[in-house]
């Protein structure tokens, strides 16, 4: 079949081809990114919500080449002519009735190799790393959130730019994307050569990742819910008294009062009598306050009345359905009247922020935007409702992006003194640009659900969105309660073991956050100091704070260099086919290999039930870990050097998550602190792991404003070549920057360990070990 190679044509903004039944439009956005549009008629796609990049015209030397057959089928090759992907059949069928009349249902097939893994798609609770064979209708929900993007082990990615419910189907050779409403077929092919390159491309296309506040990388304590201001304050004081680090405290719902006042965005509950002073007291203890806000409103609230007057409320069933709180199942004879707002409307987003500003003026630090999916009990005809951007069907999946970006944009316009931080439950492509971290919804407190969180977080990261976490311990632990009682899960050894292992996984998430219903999660609920479970929890939290300089420096690489916190093994070791489908190991940053313990090793069962069994938490326990080929590995706790490409038996006592360091790594460790900003980073231990060359850029700034965007930060480059370490000249400065730093250098090569102390004033230093 004759094809035309578009990449050798003249440099144009776009190239149009006319096939038998469809027109094809090819637009280069960069040498690596090309947009394909197909239409049965004229091209009239409105502006993309996700894509913010402008096309650059057909490059003289594209890294991806496009050819179009007479029937409109597109093939992609790399610069050397190696085939990357070929389309299969496409379909653009007119919708002839209903509110979407005049639009089309659109679909496109892609021919993949049968043994070609793909990754991404958002948050799937399926426990799989390789997502071949998926067949599902993708629509945002509580525990599963989708973005129409996948990337291949071949180093390319596909972003299907459509916001309606979309079905992915895969018969083993054909992956098909089919959307219920669209202007046209519209997708982007991104060739990065590897996973990092694809992520760089999707962020260039849809938005870069801003820096989050330093404190957000500390430990967060939450519960469903703190019922009084005093109860929350007692938790913050309890951590300070126990000398266990804490940075974030989170206030869940109903600080506004009853369900008719749902999400009033003000403190109307008499159990929170002095919110301004309360927030100030939290700050005086070195902690930060996040607060729950929703995308729905009760009928007795100010925002409800304003939005209703403007016709900016939807009429579908959302949560809570009952006006009476704390009754399950809900009393539908007392309907709450709670409804979601039309976040697709710029005017509605203005109203939302103008009401949220009451909380902003209290000096709240961060927003917990719950139910951005949103919660929706579907009825026939709901998707026929009209939003400010068209039918709800046509834009359903970008609802979370509209909600979250609305708050981000308004806060950025309000002030540059406080970085935006949003914890949210749902996601769509582009949301990585909004200062948001997405959690995986209301998971069950089971080992099975815990195991699912690891590949979920990794596949989410492979969509280009690096900020992700889950409810440590799972949201629903009630099966562990003593029969007839509540708040007893934390005394149940079955839940204790699960909680500790989930916490150890959370230690290596971008956000370390404990949350759930039916049981208090504060450290003292699990025992007391000197007891194995308590000590294991404290050890994990303290290690998080030791790693803060490493984590924050990684955050800078995420912002400045398209990096990722949680790295699926295919990102660094794609040449090792054994890692292509490993769902329970990952890199945290570029240096740390994490292998969470995902099975019960100390208790007798993984069932969710009450147990009073006596557990020997000190007995030896072991698990198997695969060390990827392509590197040697140091065991974190012992320093033992191991070869890659083998499975090893790792010690896994209750207070230890198997952890390895890639040979050729530099890891800065911070001081012992009670909160992230308690002490400056002027006295650090720096661990240097030899056996390969190493590069690391240490980053520091003012911690919680946007001055870094204007160059107010500093970086220090560490380079290891053989046994010689060079600490480069300090680049940049910021207000409050230490003029001098002490570095305690600890070098190991598996045979010997050498320690050096360096007084660093900002000029380059060379050290030989």
Language-model segments: what does each one mean?
Residues 1-21:
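Bacterial Sec-dependent N-terminal signal peptides
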Residues 26, 36-38, 63, 74-76, ...:
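Short, well-ordered beta-strand segments enriched in hydrophobic/aromatic residues
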Residues 27-64, 92-97:
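A low-complexity, Ser/Thr/Gly/Pro-enriched, surface-exposed linker/loop concept
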Residues 45-55, 80-96, 734-751:
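Extended Gly/Ser/Thr-rich low-complexity repeat segments
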Residues 57-213, 223-224, 229, 236-241, ...:
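Catalytic and substrate-binding clefts that recognize carbohydrates or anionic sugar/phosphate headgroups
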Residues 87, 98, 247-537, 572-574:
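Aromatic- and carboxylate-enriched substrate-binding clefts and catalytic-loop regions
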Residues 234-254:
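Catalytic domains of carbohydrate-active enzymes, especially glycoside hydrolases
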Residues 408-420, 427-439, 460-470, 475-724, ...:
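Catalytic core of carbohydrate-active enzymes
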């Amino acid at each position: 079949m004759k094809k035309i190679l578009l990449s050798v044509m003249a440099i144009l903004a776009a190239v149009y081809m006319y096939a038998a039944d469809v027109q094809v439009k090819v637009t280069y956005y960069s040498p690596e990114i090309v947009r394909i549009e197909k239409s049965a008629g004229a091209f009239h796609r409105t502006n993309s919500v996700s894509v913010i990049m402008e096309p650059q015209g057909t490059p003289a030397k594209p890294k991806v080449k496009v050819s179009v057959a007479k029937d409109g089928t597109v093939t992609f090759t790399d610069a050397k002519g190696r085939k990357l992907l070929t389309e299969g059949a496409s379909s653009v069928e007119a919708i002839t009735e209903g509110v979407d009349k005049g639009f089309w249902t659109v679909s496109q097939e892609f021919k993949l190799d049968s043994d070609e893994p793909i990754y991404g798609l958002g948050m799937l609770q399926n426990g799989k790393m390789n997502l071949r064979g998926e067949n599902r209708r993708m629509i945002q929900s509580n525990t599963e959130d989708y973005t129409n993007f996948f990337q291949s082990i071949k180093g390319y990615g596909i972003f299907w730019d459509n916001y309606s419910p979309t079905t992915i189907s895969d018969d083993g050779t054909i992956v098909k994307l089919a959307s219920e409403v669209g202007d046209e077929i519209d997708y982007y092919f991104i060739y990065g050569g590897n996973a990092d390159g694809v992520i760089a491309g999707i962020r260039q296309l849809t938005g870069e990742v801003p820096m989050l506040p330093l404190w957000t990388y500390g430990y967060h304590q939450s519960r469903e819910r703190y019922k009084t201001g005093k109860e929350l304050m007692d938790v913050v004081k309890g951590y300070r008294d126990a000398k266990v680090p804490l940075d974030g405290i989170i206030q869940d719902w109903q600080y506004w009062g009853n369900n008719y006042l749902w999400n009033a965005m003000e403190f109307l509950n008499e159990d929170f009598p002095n919110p301004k002073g309360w927030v100030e007291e939290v700050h005086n203890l070195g902690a930060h306050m996040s607060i729950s806000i929703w995308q729905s409103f009760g009928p007795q609230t100010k925002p409800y009345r304003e939005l209703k007057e403007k016709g900016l409320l939807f009429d579908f069933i959302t949560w809570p359905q009952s006006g009476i709180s704390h009754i399950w199942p809900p009393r539908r004879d007392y309907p709450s009247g709670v409804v979601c707002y039309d976040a697709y409307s710029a005017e509605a987003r203005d109203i939302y922020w103008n009401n949220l500003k009451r909380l902003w003026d209290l000096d709240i630090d961060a927003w917990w935007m719950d139910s951005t999916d949103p919660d929706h009990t579907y009825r026939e005809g709901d998707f026929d409702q009209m939003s400010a951007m068209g039918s709800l069907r046509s834009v359903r999946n970008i609802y979370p992006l509209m909600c979250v970006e609305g708050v981000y944009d308004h806060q950025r316009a309000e002030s540059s003194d406080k970085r935006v931080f949003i914890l949210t439950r749902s996601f769509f492509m582009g949301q990585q640009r909004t200062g948001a971290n997405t959690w995986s919804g209301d998971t069950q407190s089971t080992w099975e659900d815990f195991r699912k969180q690891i590949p979920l977080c990794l596949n989410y990261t492979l969509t280009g969105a690096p900020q992700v976490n889950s409810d440590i311990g799972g949201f629903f632990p009630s099966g562990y309660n003593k029969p007839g009682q509540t708040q007893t899960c934390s005394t149940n050894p079955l839940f204790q073991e699960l909680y500790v292992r989930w916490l150890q996984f959370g230690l290596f998430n971008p956000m370390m956050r404990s949350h759930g219903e039916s049981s208090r999660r504060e450290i003292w609920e699990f025992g007391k100091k000197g007891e194995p479970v308590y000590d294991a929890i404290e050890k994990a939290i303290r290690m998080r704070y030791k790693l803060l300089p490493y984590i924050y420096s990684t955050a800078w690489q995420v912002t400045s260099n398209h990096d990722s916190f949680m790295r699926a093994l295919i990102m660094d070791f794609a040449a090792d086919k054994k890692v292509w489908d490993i769902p329970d190991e990952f890199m945290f940053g570029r240096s740390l290999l994490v292998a969470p313990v995902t099975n019960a090793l100390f208790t007798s069962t993984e069932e969710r039930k009450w147990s009073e069994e006596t557990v020997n938490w000190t007995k030896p326990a072991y698990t198997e870990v695969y060390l990827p080929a392509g590197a040697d590995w140091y065991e974190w706790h012992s320093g033992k050097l191991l070869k890659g490409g083998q499975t090893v038996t790792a010690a896994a006592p209750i207070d230890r998550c198997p952890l390895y360091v890639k040979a050729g790594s530099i890891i800065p460790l911070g001081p012992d602190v009670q909160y992230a900003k308690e002490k400056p980073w002027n006295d650090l231990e720096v661990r240097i792991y030899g056996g390969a060359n190493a590069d690391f850029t240490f980053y520091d700034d003012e911690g919680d404003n946007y001055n870094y965007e204007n160059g107010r930060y500093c970086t220090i480059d560490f380079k290891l070549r053989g046994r010689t370490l060079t600490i480069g000249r300090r680049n940049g400065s910021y207000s409050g920057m230490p003029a001098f730093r002490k570095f305690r250098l600890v070098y190991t090569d598996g045979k010997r360990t050498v320690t050096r102390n360096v007084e660093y004033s900002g000029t380059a230093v060379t050290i030989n070990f």
